[in-house]
UniProtKB/Swiss-Prot annotation:
The record marks T100 as: Interaction with substrate tRNA. The keyword Ribonucleoprotein does not apply. The gene is miaA. Monomer. This is tRNA dimethylallyltransferase. Pfam families: IPPT. It comes from the Bacteria. It comes from Oleidesulfovibrio alaskensis (strain ATCC BAA-1058 / DSM 17464 / G20). The keyword Nucleotide-binding applies. Keywords: ATP-binding, Magnesium, Nucleotide-binding, Transferase, tRNA processing. Residues 34-37, 158-162 are annotated as: Interaction with substrate tRNA.
Length: 305
């Protein structure tokens, strides 16, 4: 089995610093496991590692997708698995780093082999959701796939749309696909959670927003708008991106933009903490305790050389 180290946790907790340290100690290669950091036009707003940080060791799957391209767990697996295999073959320790828990779960536990959904079908359901609202589509899903509807919040528009598009495109409910057996994982994983409390994170997140603005986040958003001026494009859905879009369009003041940005980031961190607290065999460690992280990685992954 291929040893991998997964470094997860809420946004702003210090995952990047931990990954760079472990990569230096264990001759590691960093692989992005964050659905927002794939977008090439938002390196500052999505807090991607700097070019200097990326030059310190191999980095993969950062800043390569266009604003109108859609990332998913399936796309992530198709890209990440060959990279993990190649880096392991070169004697480097793969480090999966990010806050998208679904991608980590797909990698370690497998994912349903759902066929690609035609863009026309996806767009149709997105437009219906925008026109009718998520609760109305949730009621429709209750009739078509009650098992999936039961576990989704009526306002969870993204997952409701996903379930309906799968139902239409494949003729089978999403719950059927999720019930199908998946092959065993080829990875031996150690999972590190960079610990943080929501109250402890909040001032750090507020400071990070100010640092992003000072680093050119507003110009970054303006440039991105010149590339794609469609707020429903996948790249614009990220926190920070959507709020800056509203500010540039004159819908909110800069102060309100920053308030919404912080509020939405905090809510996202809360959801991440809830998700990762349910993750089995996850070792929560202080982000500054690099020695403890080293011991944990040594005990499970050992040396790749």
């Amino acid at each position: 089995m291929i040893p991998v180290v997964c470094i997860v946790g809420p946004t702003g907790a210090g995952k990047t610093a931990a990954s760079l340290h472990l990569a230096a100690v264990f001759d590691g290669a960093v692989i992005n496991c964050d659905s927002r950091q794939v977008y090439k036009d938002f390196p500052v707003i999505t807090a991607q590692p700097t070019l200097e940080e990326q030059a310190s060791c191999p980095h993969h799957l950062y800043g390569f997708m266009g604003i109108q391209e859609k990332m998913s767990a399936g796309v992530f697996l198709d890209m990440a698995c060959p990279i993990i295999k190649e880096e392991h073959a070169h004697g480097r320790l793969p480090l999966l780093v990010g806050g998208t828990g679904l991608y980590l779960r797909a990698l370690l536990d497998g994912i349903a082999a759902i066929p690609d959904i035609p863009e026309t079908v996806s767009q149709k359901w997105q437009e219906r959701c925008a026109a009718r609202g998520a609760p109305a589509l949730h009621r429709l899903l209750e009739a078509q796939d009650p098992q999936t509807a039961e576990r989704l919040h009526p306002n969870d528009s993204q997952r409701i749309v996903r379930a309906l598009e799968v139902q239409e495109a494949t003729g089978r409910p999403l719950s059927w696909w999720h019930a199908q057996p998946v092959p065993p994982s080829p990875y031996r994983a150690v999972k590190i959670g960079v610990s943080a409390t929501l109250d402890g994170l909040t001032p750090r997140l507020a400071k990070r927003i100010e640092m992003m603005l000072a680093a050119g986040a507003l110009d970054e958003a303006r440039n991105a708008m010149g590339i794609c001026d469609n707020p429903r494009a996948p790249g614009w859905s990220g926190i920070g991106c959507a709020e800056l879009y509203s500010y540039i369009k004159g819908a909110v003041s800069l102060d309100e933009c920053k308030r919404l940005w912080l509020h939405n980031t905090r809510q996202y961190a809360k959801r991440q903490l809830t998700w990762f607290r349910r993750e089995p065999n996850l070792h929560w460690l202080d982000g500054t305790d690099m020695a403890a992280m080293e011991r944990l990685v040594h005990s499970v992954a050992g040396s790749t050389g």
